[in-house]
Amino acid sequence: MGLVRSFALVIVFLSCLIAVYGQGTRIGFYSTTCPNAETIVRTTVASHFGSDPKVAPGLLRMHNHDCFVQGCDGSVLLSGPNSERTAGANVNLHGFEVIDDAKRQLEAACPGVVSCADILALAARDSVSLTNGQSWQVPTGRRDGRVSLASNVNNLPSPSDSLAIQQRKFSAFRLNTRDLVTLVGGGHTIGTAACGFITNRIFNSSGNTADPTMDQTFVPQLQRLCPQNGDGSARVDLDTGSGNTFDTSYFINLSRNRGILQSDHVLWTSPATRSIVQEFMAPRGNFNVQFARSMVKMSNIGVKTGTNGEIRRVCSAVN
């Protein structure tokens, strides 16, 4: 009954949100022009996920990075010598081949109809459901942008950001502190981080020791996974013990001072966000409902609709 109630709450929330944040997108945008669009995307993501589970956190992260730079217009998908894909924060993005595969199939079924920006938004949702998260309805109708510049990627959230900096970056897109905790938590309950992002926390804090605010019984485990003389490219789960499952254990780890990144850890140590973390520690329920709500809100940042932008024939290049 609890899961049924949670799903019902998601639907109610989304019905309200679409009216507020829709900006021209709507649920079922392709119901007549390409009725199998969402099925094609879902099947494609599932097929790739079966052979490479890393595409799930990769696609979720890619969608977030797309929306935080010029809005959710698929600009992160464009390739080129100075495109967003070449920026330092994006060089390790994973899953472009999934979007390209889905686009090829959609062009065969419905030429020139489904945008790459919508494919990415749908793929992010499907990635969550494939990793045991709750699904939600994604408003569609975005069009694709024509500009992609590495120089525009400067304002993406960083692993070392303080809470104040994270709040400033999120509020620039009308995302509040609750959205921040929700989206960071959802993005980090699956996937990994490079050791280079945590070396200073586990070796080079005050007195050349680990950050004293971390769980000191957890530090040796991280030091074994990320040796001090390593090259920093090895990776560790962002949600220790549950890195492949979309669940609430990320928040439980935060409460145990086991947040991997500094930007994670401050969500627990800061009074402004601790109560939200505590709320989301409960199994499913509130977190899943809020995640769907915040994802819809984020996915409508700066969208192009109507005659703005284009429908790319190939996601990596403008028409």
From Swiss-Prot:
One example of a Gene Ontology biological process annotation: response to oxidative stress
EC number: 1.11.1.7
Gene Ontology molecular functions: heme binding; lactoperoxidase activity; metal ion binding; peroxidase activity
Binding positions (heme b): H188
Enzyme class: oxidoreductase
Pfam families: peroxidase (PF00141)
Binding site for Ca(2+) 2: T189, D239, S242, D247
Induction cue: Transiently induced a few minutes after mechanical wounding.
Record: residues binding substrate: P157
Domain of life: Eukaryota
Carbohydrate attachment residues: N204, N253
Annotated binding of Ca(2+) 1, by residue: D66, V69, G71, D73, S75
Active site per UniProt: H65 (proton acceptor)
Locations listed in the record: Secreted
Signal sequence residues: 1-22
Catalytic reactions on record: 2 a phenolic donor + H2O2 = 2 a phenolic radical donor + 2 H2O
Keywords: Calcium, Disulfide bond, Glycoprotein, Heme, Hydrogen peroxide, Iron, Metal-binding, Oxidoreductase, Peroxidase, Secreted, Signal
Tissue expression per record: Mainly expressed in roots.
CDD domains: secretory_peroxidase (cd00693)
Names of required cofactors: heme b; Ca(2+)
Gene Ontology cellular-component terms listed: extracellular region; Golgi apparatus
Disulphide bridges, residue numbers: C34-C110, C67-C72, C116-C315, C195-C226
Cofactor note: Binds 1 heme b (iron(II)-protoporphyrin IX) group per subunit. Binds 2 calcium ions per subunit.
Family as reported in the entry's similarity comment: Belongs to the peroxidase family. Classical plant (class III) peroxidase subfamily.
Name under which the protein is recorded: Peroxidase 62
Organism: Arabidopsis thaliana
